Amino acid sequence: MSRLVIALGACLLAAFALAADRLAPPAGVEVYFIAPQNGAKLHSPVTVKFGLKGMGIAPAGIKFDNTGHHHLLIDTDFSELNLDAPMPATDKIVHFGKGQTETTLTLAPGKHTLQLVFADYLHQSFDPPLHSKKITITVE
């Protein structure tokens, strides 16, 4: 039993040691969609263009001051994210770790929500978090 407690304690210490403090962004940063616009009615595939003011873009894994990269939430609520952990890569949370500023999505017909989250070189949210307004589009 004591070995188990020691092992669990070691794992917890390792997790805390690996946890990075969230970086503070400069004041006045804006994350937004260039396209599509909120309420747009489109056909799939949908081209999505990302906007950013007040910071720069850098690939994931490369630490430069005041830079980061985009993540796109598709039909996912920002409030569901664990901001104290790196963002997971899923079919609903798309990483653009090469520094991309646009993508093409194949979406099923119907209403969809999109939201951008800008994160640091470790896929970690800034503190305070940087994100766009959520937009809703309709794919016809």
What are these regions (language model features)?
Residues 1-4:
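Positively charged n-region of N-terminal signal peptides that target proteins for export
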Residues 14-16:
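N-terminal signal peptide c-region/cleavage motif recognized by signal peptidases
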Residues 21-43:
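Short, compositionally biased P/S/T/A/G/V-rich stretches that sit at domain boundaries
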Residues 46-50, 101, 110-118:
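Short, well-structured beta-strand segments within conserved domains
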Residues 51-62:
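Short amphipathic, basic-aromatic surface patches that mediate peripheral association
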Residues 62-70, 131:
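Short coil-to-beta strand junction motifs in C2/discoidin
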Residues 83-105:
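A beta-strand/beta-hairpin structural motif
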Residues 108-123, 131-135:
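Internal, hydrophobic beta-strand segments that form the core of beta-sheet-rich folds
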